[in-house]
Design a protein with these regions (language model features):
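N-terminal pre-domain/capping segments
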Residues: 1-90, 94, 130, 159, ...
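Short, electropositive alpha-helical surface patch
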Residues: 55, 60, 114-127, 153-162
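Active-site groove signature of glycoside hydrolases
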Residues: 89, 93-113, 137
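Active-site-adjacent beta->alpha loops and helix N-cap segments on the catalytic face
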Residues: 43-53, 110-121
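Acidic/histidine-rich catalytic cores of soluble enzymes
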Residues: 34-35, 128-181
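Gly/Pro-rich active-site loop or hairpin
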Residues: 16-17, 24, 72-80, 112, ...
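Active-site-proximal loop/turn and secondary-structure-junction residues that shape catalytic pockets
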Residues: 10-12, 39-43, 67-70, 105-109, ...
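Short glycine/serine/threonine/alanine-rich loop segments
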Residues: 59, 98, 134
């Protein structure tokens, strides 16, 4: 029932130019049940090549993590760009067989300074994810105004169907680890 997933973000970074082609070799060196595929901004230029490469690798990828600037765009009120990028991320997720997609609903320097933008955007993001048959998961990202748990409660109140993913590093930053139990 439970699976141990490795984030591809732990394997691909600046030191190896975030070369997704390295996943084929690197994935064989790990003992895990599957992967959370982490999307990066640089890959928007080559979406089809990315999808083809991932399919050829035949990795089990039940979860995709959206490119992190989506939440920052939402926070800044750049909704059209955020929705465009999120749609691309959902398309990729669907093509590689992911069942769920993680998004930072707020992020960057703006973070949760305009949480009303982030709250307003959730419904549209959910509609886009639903179009691809993918479950949307909201991560407890670090805040610079309030805290993630407060925002999760606001989301749950307004959207009872919302699903979350709990990042222990983010929770520790806000001293919210105990709230999981």
């Amino acid at each position: 029932m439970f699976k141990i997933l490795c984030s591809t973000g732990a394997l691909l970074g600046k030191s190896n130019n975030r070369d997704y082609k390295l996943l084929k070799e690197l994935s064989t060196k790990l003992t895990c049940d599957g992967f959370e595929f982490m999307m990066y901004t640089a890959w928007y230029e080559e979406v089809e090549a990315l999808i083809t490469a991932l399919k050829e690798m035949q990795l089990y990828i039940p979860v995709m993590h959206c490119e992190k600037h989506i939440g920052e765009a939402i926070s800044k009120g750049e909704f059209d760009e955020a929705y465009r990028r999120f749609d691309i991320n959902c398309y990729i997720a669907g093509e590689i067989g992911a069942e769920s997609i993680v998004v930072h609903l707020w992020d960057g320097i703006t973070s949760d300074a305009h949480f009303e933008n982030n709250l307003a955007a959730y419904g549209k993001l959910k509609d886009i994810a639903d179009k691809y048959g993918i479950k949307l998961l909201i991560e407890n990202v670090v805040c610079n105004q309030e805290d993630p748990m407060k925002h999760w409660c606001e989301l749950k109140e307004r959207f009872p169907e919302v699903h979350f993913v709990f990042d222990t590093k983010m929770a520790a930053f806000h001293s919210q680890m105990d709230l999981l139990y």
